[in-house]
């Protein structure tokens, strides 16, 4: 079986581990700025001004971190 790289999970996990602030753009145009505290296949837990918000991934358009992240991709 071929191992596949899940870029989405690696990206979100790196943002979480490094505590990088991220702007989340929703499909309705709304923006949330905060820190990723966790995620699963369907949701992202974002801390915004000390409060937690659970966002469904199907409502998200874009993640824009405040700075670039570096992560390794296995080949």
Swiss-Prot record:
Homohexamer. Residues 9-69 form the Sm domain. This is RNA-binding protein Hfq. One of its GO terms (biological process) is regulation of DNA-templated transcription. The keyword Nucleus does not apply. RNA chaperone that binds small regulatory RNA (sRNAs) and mRNAs to facilitate mRNA translational regulation in response to envelope stress, environmental stress and changes in metabolite concentrations. Also binds with high specificity to tRNAs. It comes from the Bacteria. It comes from Geobacillus kaustophilus (strain HTA426). GO terms for molecular function: RNA binding. One of its GO terms (cellular component) is cytosol. The keyword RNA-binding applies. Keywords: RNA-binding, Stress response. Belongs to the Hfq family. Pfam families: Hfq (PF17209).
């Amino acid at each position: 079986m071929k191992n596949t790289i899940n870029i989405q999970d690696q990206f979100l996990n790196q943002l979480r581990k490094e505590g990088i602030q991220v702007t989340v753009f929703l499909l309705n145009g709304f923006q949330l700025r905060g820190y990723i505290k966790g995620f699963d296949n369907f949701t992202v837990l974002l801390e915004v001004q000390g409060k937690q918000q659970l966002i469904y991934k199907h409502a998200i358009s874009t993640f824009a971190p405040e700075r670039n992240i570096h992560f390794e991709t296995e080949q």
